[in-house]
Amino acid sequence: MGLGMWLRTGVLMAFLTGLLMAIGYVLGNETGMMFAFMFALVMNFFSYWYSDKIVLTWYRARILEEDEAPELYEIVRGLAQEAGIPTPKIAIVPTETPNAFATGRNPKNAVVAVTQGLLRILNRDELEGVIAHELSHIKNRDVLIQTLAAVMAGAIMMVARWAGWMLWLGGFGGRDRDRDASGALGAILLIVLAPIAAMLIQMAISRAREYLADETGAKISGKPWALARALEKIEHAVSMRPIKNGNPATAHMFIINPFRGVSFAELFSTHPPTQKRIERLRKIAENMGIAF
């Protein structure tokens, strides 16, 4: 992992640790902040080593053996060779909402996850376009920071909600009446600000990485038009059937935001507008001398 990726990962972990410590301070002054710091250290450790497994578990994704999906493995292996990276494992997500994401801490430990719905609505060319996009995230070393952000943001949202309820119920002892009187306000701030912080973390991952993955993926597959058609199909399907049981903290990991129109997450755009992505793919095709 290069110096730039180490720096980005370190900044992300430091920011998330600081946010957890701030929550701890609101709840229990210096003692609460110290407990939050210890919790953050544990979370950072487990997030680095196990975040990919955590994300796959959230979506009940199952690793496929090659004999279960030989054609899919053939596509992934060929594109991975073209990209110059090891062939990642493939996971299937049991939902009819078409989408895909990549996870893992490095190219040697990567997984490309696709939904049942994606395999159902895309033809082979379009599927190659999507797979190439996800392999680009692996090649460009985006997957580690994307996965860390998803797990840590999810943890922050969970802790803040739990802390908010405890403040409402007066579950933290040892505080004076002034602190108790401020409990309701603290709970409101935690409940409101935690989802905002989680969405800001996703935005900080940089929407530019999606443009880069589109461009790199188009060059890997040699079919920018196929990726454009796939994006149109996925966008339409997600607008009709968004994922309802997933974790909004993972929105930035998917090729298209799967939570469109179903939650507070819609206020924060984790992806560039699909139409702009298609227009950029059109220009890429022209530069490659390929009909669009």
Curated annotation (Swiss-Prot):
The entry's active site is 134
Enzyme type, top EC level? hydrolase
Where do the annotations place Zn(2+) binding?
Answer: 133, 137, 210
Transmembrane parts of this sequence: 9-29, 31-51, 148-168, 185-205
Looking up Pfam families in the UniProt record yields: Peptidase_M48
Gene3D superfamilies tied to this protein? Metalloproteases ('zincins'), catalytic domain (3.30.2010.10)
UniProt-recorded Gene Ontology molecular function terms? metalloendopeptidase activity; zinc ion binding
Q: Which cofactor does it need?
A: Zn(2+)
Which keywords are on file for this protein?
Answer: Cell membrane, Hydrolase, Membrane, Metal-binding, Metalloprotease, Protease, Transmembrane, Transmembrane helix, Zinc
> Which EC number(s) are documented for this chain?
3.4.24.-
Is this entry keyworded Aminoacyl-tRNA synthetase? no
Cofactor descriptive note: Binds 1 zinc ion per subunit.
The record's listing under InterPro entries reads:
HtpX_protease (IPR050083), Pept_M48_protease_HtpX (IPR022919), Peptidase_M48 (IPR001915)
Location relative to the cell: Cell membrane
Lineage top rank: taxon? Archaea
Q: What Gene Ontology terms for biological process does this UniProt record contain? A: proteolysis
> Could you give one GO CC term from the UniProt record?
plasma membrane
Mode of membrane association: Multi-pass membrane protein
**PANTHER family (alphabetical):** PROTEASE HTPX (PTHR43221), PROTEASE HTPX HOMOLOG (PTHR43221:SF2)
Family as reported in the entry's similarity comment: Belongs to the peptidase M48B family.
Q: Which HAMAP family match?
A: Pept_M48_protease_HtpX
What this protein is called in its record is Protease HtpX homolog
Question: Which species is this record about?
Answer: Thermococcus sibiricus (strain DSM 12597 / MM 739)
